[in-house]
Amino acid sequence: MKSTFHEKDSRATTILERIHTDVCGPFSVASTTKNRYYVIFVNDFSRKCWILFMQKKSKTFSNFCEFKALVEKESRKQVKALRSDNGGEFISGEFKYFCSAEGIQRELIAPHNPQQNGVAERKNRMIVSAARVMLHFRAFPYTCGLRHATLRFMCKTVVLIEYFT
């Protein structure tokens, strides 16, 4: 039985104090670069988000490493906490070791309680909904789906990073 969740988390007081993350996909139609997934990283303080497209969920760890290097270089601050679900891509030994070595506190949400990671879940819902609307009205080809929806609707608060590997 699903438990109820009432506790409200305090919001971060500085950038990179807490990052929310989630993987979305697979999508039935791949992008022009064969990507069927994306991983989203949301800064709890500013709500700015970064989206990295990927062909396989197994790229989540390497994408996190690249994201971390990018934001820490830009901000000159360290990622302090990472909130994610208990998906296999986030609980691998490699991921645990990296976070431990870098001093990143892991906040793994309870199974079957996505509301505990509501920040990332809401961003995912907004992006996917925008893509569906644009596809419905034929605003762009199916293969451009999420990438174009993200660019059009969230360009002020989203940073897209698409790797052509």
Q: Locations of the language-model features?
A:
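Anionic group-binding determinants
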Residues: 1-165
